[in-house]
Amino acid sequence: MSRSLTGALAHSFLGQSPRWYKAVIALFLVLNPLLLATLGPVVTGWVLVIQFIFTLGMALKCYPLMPGGLLLVEALLLRMTTPEALYEELQHNFPVILLLMFMVAGIHFMKELLLFLFSRILLGVRSKAVLSLLFCVLSAFLSAFLDALTVTAVIISAAVGFYAVYHRVASGTNPREESALDSDHQVEQLHREDLDQFRAFLRSLLMHGAVGTALGGVCTLVGEPQNLLIGHEMGWHFADFFLKVAPVSMPVLAAGLVTCVLLEKLRLFGYGTLMPERVRQVLAAYAAEDDAARTQAQRIALVVQGLAALILIVCLGLHIAEVGLIGLMVIVLITAFTGITDEHRLGRAFQDAMPFTALLVVFFAVVAVIHQQQLFSPLIAWVLALPSEQQPGMLYLANGLLSAISDNVFVATIYITEVKQAFVNGAMSREHFETLAVAINTGTNLPSVATPNGQAAFLFLLTSAIAPLIRLSYGRMVWMALPYTVVMGGLGWWAVTYWL
């Protein structure tokens, strides 16, 4: 009986994660108390940070909330930080939690409008370079005001929808009936080459769209969660943030868009594949049927969502309230005027954001450990000991390298908190503090496109239903992101070092 119970517990521990991963996490949990007793809290604190970064890097094996949460519960039990310190961190960063709770849910109710826009662009533009540029620009613009995860989710929804239609037609089934999209056994030989080409076409569009969310997300206060966190620490509103970051974000945005066009024209790194004409004909016929069947209520819903989007942009620009509260207003407006009154439909809007919100609380627990043990103080002191003109570039590199393997919200939280503490202690002027804040913000946003680990939108794309269908693997995503990483990361460093 005891063996079966032990086996069942081992099997259920961290669910479907690989055995080696479960063993590593268990080893961490056993090792930490021993390290604390023998080597002290500072060494153990650094080990804990590395362990937590490991859980973020292995996000495809297991969502980091569970293993990271276990490590931080242990840290609390070992008194490496206190519940009171964690609560203070949460209070201090409450605007970020509000953003994730309400803004992401609010944008969920705009999905029909966003899906409508992306679908029109996909079928209305024949030039692949222009189409890719439009996807990148629209993703960047939307991510500057909305949530990058939601924008990515909309692009994925459009891609899944179009892929499903053509896959069913290629398999000889009704495009409006459910079928197994993950199997090509029934795909007719005539359509196989077109299907493979369509997969490559969708891969490139999705990558352009995902990069677009990073290009736009760095620009504004609400573009990424870490932006709001940094803006909150600095006391910047929407317009303030945009203007402070613009010397870096605007040149990088322009360079990113030029890169998008060049990749398509030169057909490098897996880009440049065109949509097969037979696929276009099938999708256009399907879209025409949808337009003809659209009801008056659905048309009204699109108008309401469009008006709500305009109100959202105006409210953000004028900073009439905290960002999360504006998101709550969007929820109320759209649901009230489109007749969504069922609490189960409302609840689905919060499903995407709440796991990451919970993970963010774990981030703040790690930050509380770092504060209490003063882990990053020597590193920040070393950076601040450099000549002032070298400090922004060095912080940018430090943030960029760590953000590429870890989560950029976590990295930004650590660095902005430590730099602000140095400012409070009188180690720098307000002007220099603002320069370092911009370096931290851009350092966590731009080089992190290198891997899916750094950008939540990239990780979301990699773990979505569309990735296996279009053969988008981790390695292929890194390869396709490489030119963007070099251009955005390199120009970002140059701008931070010489233009701020």
From Swiss-Prot:
Membrane spanning stretches: 34-54, 58-78, 96-116, 129-149, 150-170, 205-225, 241-261, 311-331, 350-370, 394-414, 450-470, 477-497
Q: Which cysteines are joined by disulfide bonds?
A: none
Q: What is its main location?
A: membrane
Kindly indicate whether the keyword Cell inner membrane belongs to this entry: yes
* Superkingdom per UniProt: Bacteria
Q: Which GO terms describe its molecular function?
A: sodium:proton antiporter activity
Q: What is this protein called?
A: Na(+)/H(+) antiporter NhaB
Q: Which gene encodes it?
A: nhaB
